């Protein structure tokens, strides 16, 4: 993370991947250093396109912003998960083949494997332009 460059700008776009329902500690540290900045957040999350879940994530991530920073806007989309996650889900399902939740987790991993897509990225770019430039 290049915090010095970010701190020199008036508006900062910060990208992150969802880590246990929030952002990584390094992103949290960057956000806490962005005093007086307008901040646009964009991120990926392994679990589906649920706007209410995305809002919960953004609320948790935003709680790391410096007190005098302004959230200019945000965008989230589904993101891929690593192969170790798939292996864990497969092992869980092997132990309990009738478990609907485990099946849903594995199905979601498959659905997420090609994300973010070009459409996801285009939507994020459009949201950033609208929030930052008013376009």
Residue spans of the language-model regions?
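A short, well-structured beta->alpha microelement
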Residues: 1-5
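FMN-binding flavodoxin-like domain, especially the glycine-rich phosphate-binding loop
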Residues: 9-14, 19-135
């Amino acid at each position: 993370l290049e915090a010095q460059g970010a701190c020199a700008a008036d508006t900062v776009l910060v990208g992150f991947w969802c880590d246990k329902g929030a952002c990584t500690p390094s992103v949290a540290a960057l956000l806490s250093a962005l005093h007086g900045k307008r901040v646009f957040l964009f991120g990926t999350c392994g679990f589906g396109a649920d706007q209410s879940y995305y809002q919960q994530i953004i609320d948790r991530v935003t709680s790391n912003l410096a007190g005098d920073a302004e959230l200019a806007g945000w965008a989230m989309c589904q993101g891929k998960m690593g192969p170790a996650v798939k292996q864990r889900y497969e092992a869980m399902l092997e132990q309990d083949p009738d478990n609907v939740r485990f099946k849903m987790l594995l199905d979601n991993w498959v659905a997420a494997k090609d994300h973010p897509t070009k459409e996801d990225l285009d939507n994020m770019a459009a949201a950033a332009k609208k929030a930052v430039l008013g376009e």
